[in-house]
Curated annotation (Swiss-Prot):
It comes from Clostridium perfringens (strain SM101 / Type A). This is Energy-coupling factor transporter ATP-binding protein EcfA2. One of its GO terms (biological process) is cobalt ion transport. ATP-binding (A) component of a common energy-coupling factor (ECF) ABC-transporter complex. Unlike classic ABC transporters this ECF transporter provides the energy necessary to transport a number of different substrates. Keywords: ATP-binding, Cell membrane, Membrane, Nucleotide-binding, Translocase, Transport.
Amino acid sequence: MEDYILKVEELNYNYSDGTHALKGINMNIKRGEVTAILGGNGVGKSTLFQNFNGILKPSSGRILFDNKPIDYSRKGIMKLRESIGIVFQDPDNQLFSASVYQDVSFGAVNMKLPEDEIRKRVDNALKRTGIEHLKNKPTHCLSFGQKKRVAIAGVLVMEPKVLILDEPTAGLDPMGVSEIMKLLVEMQKELGITIIIATHDIDIVPLYCDNVFVMKEGRVILQGNPKEVFAEKEVIRKVNLRLPRIGHLMEILKEKDGFVFDELDLTIGQARKTINSWKNKIFND
């Protein structure tokens, strides 16, 4: 039996200006895995995330966290936000304390934890995100990538079960993208945290994500593992997305260069294995 940490049932959300942002969303998020939400700008990804965290309340439908409907009382929402943390696309919207240590400690202080527990959690979060050496530095002096790590540490200090990240790789150089995604997968594997990301960086999805949902105009139109989702090439392109670069290369090799592949590989490792197998078969024949 599948273990889902979040269940979304017929979720609708309307903004006060009449915009129908989410339209009958049904979605199950598997516990302890990395899930990507894909879609163009304005399809409702950020609205969905804010519903997950209780920042917004559904117009209709419901969200279950740990098999219980979200409690929208003040106490219930405070408890929910300890368990489901959000890291926004722009960390400057999330960092407001004078120093890194103060900013990271904010959530733990708000939980009214004992001082020694706060220190322990902050030290662990700083170490986990690789920013121990920055703890006394003013937040406004940090690079964009360092600010991202501080924002993640500020959520980690509350020891959440779910970590939601809106465009975690936006604004980062290629090395920064790799480092931040490896950090997230490390947290998922070692701490058991469920990771949910929204991203336009298609190439990271087959490398780091277990599950994928594709949204269009407030609806989920595709879901599955990366291979299942990107196999629907025409649907992907119709919603202004693309295949991962390796997947596109394999598509060209198959359709234009006579290579015979059973599946569309999406990563360098998968492609090398398939091409070597194809090459050996040709030479042996």
